[in-house]
Amino acid sequence: VAAIDWLGREVRCPGAASLLAMTAASACGYCEPMRQTTGFARLPDGERIAFAVVGSGPAVVLPAWWVSNMVEDWQFDPLRRFVEGLAAGRMVVRYDRLGTGLSDRERPPETFTPEFEDATLCAVLDELGLVRMTLMGISCGGCTAVSFAARRPERVDRLVLYGSYAQGHALGPPQARTGMVDLVRSHWGLGSRLLADMFGPNWSAEDRVAFTASQRAAADAEVAADLLALIYETDVRDDLPGIRAPALVVHREHDRAMRLSGAREVAALLPHADLVTLPGDAHLPWHGDGDAVLRAIAPFLGIEGPPAPANGADADALGELSAREREVLGLVAQGLSDPQIAERLVLSPHTVHRHVANILAKLRLPTRAAAAAAAARAGLL
């Protein structure tokens, strides 16, 4: 009850943004679609860790941020476009923690430690033969990146921390943290919905359903609860001052899963760090305006970021839409919901939801309202 009461104060009512639909097709706004390859690394005791690689060049490694599935997550167009943006001249590596996704699902309780997270990252790097790399720690993956950079400075070229924190105890009152872990363990369905509300307070109902389902498919209740407990117990404040690598800390101003105050603490403790704050409240970088996150980190990584549209969607971007997508966009601009559009066009709501997500991705727009405005400017009404 304490966790639910606290979370109720932390999140807003969900809005109409449609940012999470799953789709089999993807096209990057400023590069050709890329192919993801997958493989397995082995831990010292033989457990398999699934990893995925996109692109080529100097390595950018993303430590596991929450529960995940390398293949299923790749079907989410916003995530795919974000990773493709990072992979412009770089090799991007992601992996599933033990107990999640395509990695072996059996995970003993004693492995839920920062040391085991570090060992998992090392196993993936060794399997790929990576000696030196850039680490990009997203959410709780930031703590793994910090720990690794502090203990193996010779292997880390640069450090990017997005949506990160230094001490898990600062993420909520003790009773709320304990209550949230207990809720996830005993009622993973409700717990996953509450976490979705925190990760994306302005997601549409369809987006929350999709993300909730992806969490439950990626890990069972015990693993999710133990990982959440690990997040709350992790403290890397002592590691931060000793990191020699240049660092960039990026955070959205109204992130409710990881507060901006946590990012400020991280940046203050790092000796060679810059802090960049961005508008928005979505916790993961590929939700909301993912291109803005890429533009913020591109100069630091030495890659070409996505272009900044002068006035939102332009004529060229509208030209990327299929005939069906232009038809759906016109109905969105008229204020119709996904179920209403589905009924009008004799499509399933899921298909409409996928079309809307593709429209937002192609137009590089964050919300249905912005897409409606673009449709009006283009004369689609």
Enumerate the language-model features and the residues they cover.
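Conserved HGGG/HGGXW glycine-rich cap/lid loop of the alpha/beta-hydrolase fold
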Residues: 40-104
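Conserved acidic catalytic loop of the alpha/beta-hydrolase fold
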Residues: 115-133
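Flexible "cap/lid" loop of the alpha/beta hydrolase fold
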Residues: 146, 150, 156-186
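Conserved alpha/beta-hydrolase catalytic His-Asp/Glu region
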Residues: 171, 189-234, 238-239
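Short beta-strand/loop motif that positions the catalytic acidic residue
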Residues: 243, 249-251
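Conserved alpha/beta-hydrolase "acid-adjacent" motif
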Residues: 256-262
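Catalytic active-site module of serine/aspartate enzymes centered on a nucleophile-bearing elbow/loop
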Residues: 273-312
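Helix-turn-helix DNA-binding segment
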Residues: 309-357, 361-363, 370-373, 377-380
